[in-house]
Amino acid sequence: PEIDLKLLDGQIINNENMQGKVVVFQFTASWCSVCIKEMPHLEKEVWQRFKDENFILIGVDLKEDLEVVKEFISKTEVTYSFTIDSDGSFFESFTLPKAGITRNIVIDQEGKISFLTRLYDELEFAQMIEHIDKLLK
C-alpha cells in the first residue's frame, strides 16, 4: 500500500524513504492487553537488537488521542517511534475488516510484505526475529 505517515517526532515515513530498509509496523492501542504484553519484547529483542542497522520499527496506535498515546508509550517504556492511525485507514490497508489489532507487519527492502504476526505467540515472534535478521544480512 501507499505509505505516508507522520511520526510523533515529526519525521515522515513513506514508500520512498523506506526503500532499502527493513520496516516493522507494530499495530497497537493502549487498551490492547496482548499488545502491552508484546511491547517489552519488541523493544528489547527487536528494536534494541536491530536499531543500528537499516531497520525501522514503528508503533502504529489505532484511533487514540495524542495524550493517551504519549502516556501509553511512557507506561510501556518503549523507545521506538510511534504514529497515530486516527481513522484506522492505515491499519485497514493491511487487514480484513474487523481484524484484531495485535499484529506486526514486516516490510522488506523492496517494500513488500515479507512476514506478519497475529497476537503474541513466542514461537512466531522468534520466527519474526530470525526473518528480520536474515533480511538484514
Regions found by a protein language model. Name each.
Residues 2-23, 94:
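A short beta-strand-turn-helix
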Residues 24-25, 57:
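Hydrophobic beta-strand anchors of alpha/beta hydrolase catalytic cores
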Residues 27-44:
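Conserved redox-active cysteine motifs that mediate thiol-disulfide chemistry
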Residues 29, 62, 87:
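Active-site loop/turn elements of alpha/beta-hydrolase fold enzymes
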Residues 48-53, 77:
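Short helix-capping segments at alpha-helix termini
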Residues 58, 70-109:
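Short, internal strand/loop/helix patches
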Residues 102-137:
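Thiol-/selenol-based redox modules, centered on thioredoxin-like
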